């Protein structure tokens, strides 16, 4: 079964709320295919603040689990308060997440598609107009 990879995007945004609300509406079949690139601890703390309960599982690889939990491929992130991550850590997290997503998406045998949640473009260091241009540059 091919996987769908979702990049959580900006840690200071409403993306975790969108992810949770969308997750609840998915069928069990689709939930088995989805892997989220994010920071496991950040997501758990954001869900707690928002009052959301979801089964979250930390995985190292997209073939590691095949259940209906929200499977998180962890990307390191230093933070003290969820939704208030400093700009330097946010930029590094976003770029690391995009790079991991790109790497996984190149494996066409295992990955059906890649979805990225919104990011503030300033975290791309004004070198790219957006995520599409960032990925296009990586494919040159």
Describe each region flagged by the PLM.
Residues 1-139:
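Contiguous, glycine/small-aliphatic-enriched amphipathic segments in soluble metabolic enzymes
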């Amino acid at each position: 079964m091919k996987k769908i990879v979702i990049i959580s995007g900006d840690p200071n945004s409403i993306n975790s709320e969108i992810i949770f609300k969308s997750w609840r509406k998915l069928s069990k079949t689709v939930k088995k295919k989805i892997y989220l690139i994010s920071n496991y601890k950040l997501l758990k703390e954001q869900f707690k603040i928002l009052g959301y309960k979801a089964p979250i599982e930390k995985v190292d690889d997209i073939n590691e689990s095949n259940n209906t939990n929200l499977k998180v491929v962890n990307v390191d992130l230093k933070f003290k308060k969820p939704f208030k991550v400093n700009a330097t850590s946010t930029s590094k997290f976003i770029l690391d997440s995009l790079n991991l997503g790109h790497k996984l998406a190149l494996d066409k045998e295992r990955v059906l598609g890649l979805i990225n949640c919104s990011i503030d473009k300033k975290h791309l260091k004004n070198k790219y107009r957006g995520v599409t241009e960032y990925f296009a540059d990586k494919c040159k």
